[in-house]
């Protein structure tokens, strides 16, 4: 039995928990909060040049005002395709073509929609918590496996405490991110 069998890779556990947090921030970025943000356009792909191309690869996206996103499409022949992709995306924003520029006025959210988005954000946060707890479970399984091949009881306790500390830190980060996102959503 080697010493490597008794080591727990905390860095790998931390990376997987960080991955869950990154996925949560990506999900939060896709929620429309009533404020203009280029991230609401990230999931949109345009049928360009014979393939599905991310919108941000077809032009520059700017946020000149709190309720306005402006897209300057580089290839003027793609303007109608970009406009159609935005309309068909289901993000609920009507693009306005103004020459070579597409303007996206972000409508004000009503109270009911804000509460609905807040619940969606809470759902995303819960998914992240579950993913983090699954990583914790995998780490604890590694510890049990190491114990079965000769890890000392004290070492098992130390590693378990380390994994739990990483889990607690990650869950706290999820809760903080959710609180911030819900505050942003509910702000009029």
UniProtKB/Swiss-Prot annotation:
Source organism, top-level taxon: Bacteria
Biological process, per Gene Ontology: cytoplasmic translational termination
Any Gene Ontology CC annotation: cytosol
Keyword set includes Chaperone: no
Keyword Protein biosynthesis: yes
Molecular function via GO: ribosomal large subunit binding
Compartment(s) where it occurs, according to its Swiss-Prot or TrEMBL record: Cytoplasm
InterPro entries in the cross-refs: Ribosome_recyc_fac, Ribosome_recyc_fac_dom, RRF_sf
SUPFAM superfamilies per record: Ribosome recycling factor, RRF
Keyword terms: Cytoplasm, Protein biosynthesis
Family to which the UniProt record says this protein belongs: Belongs to the RRF family.
Described purpose of this protein according to its UniProt entry: Responsible for the release of ribosomes from messenger RNA at the termination of protein biosynthesis. May increase the efficiency of translation by recycling ribosomes from one round of translation to another.
Entry protein name: Ribosome-recycling factor
């Amino acid at each position: 039995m080697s010493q490597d069998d008794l080591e727990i890779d905390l860095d790998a556990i931390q990376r997987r928990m960080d991955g869950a947090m990154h996925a949560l921030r990506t999900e939060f970025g896709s929620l429309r909060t009533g404020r203009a943000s280029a991230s609401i356009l990230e999931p949109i792909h345009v049928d360009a040049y014979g393939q599905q191309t991310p919108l941000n690869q077809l032009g520059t996206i700017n946020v000149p005002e709190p309720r306005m996103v402006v897209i300057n499409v580089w290839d003027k022949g793609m303007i109608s395709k970009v406009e159609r992709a935005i309309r068909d995306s289901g993000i609920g924003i009507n693009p306005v073509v103004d020459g070579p520029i597409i303007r996206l006025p972000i409508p004000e959210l009503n109270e009911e929609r804000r509460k609905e988005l807040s619940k969606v954000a809470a759902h995303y946060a819960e998914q992240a918590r579950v993913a983090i707890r699954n990583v914790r479970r995998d780490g604890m399984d590694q510890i049990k496996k190491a114990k079965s091949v000769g890890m000392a009881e004290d070492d098992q306790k130390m590693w378990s405490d380390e994994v739990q500390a990483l889990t607690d830190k990650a869950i706290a980060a999820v809760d903080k991110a959710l609180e911030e996102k819900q505050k942003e959503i509910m702000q009029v």
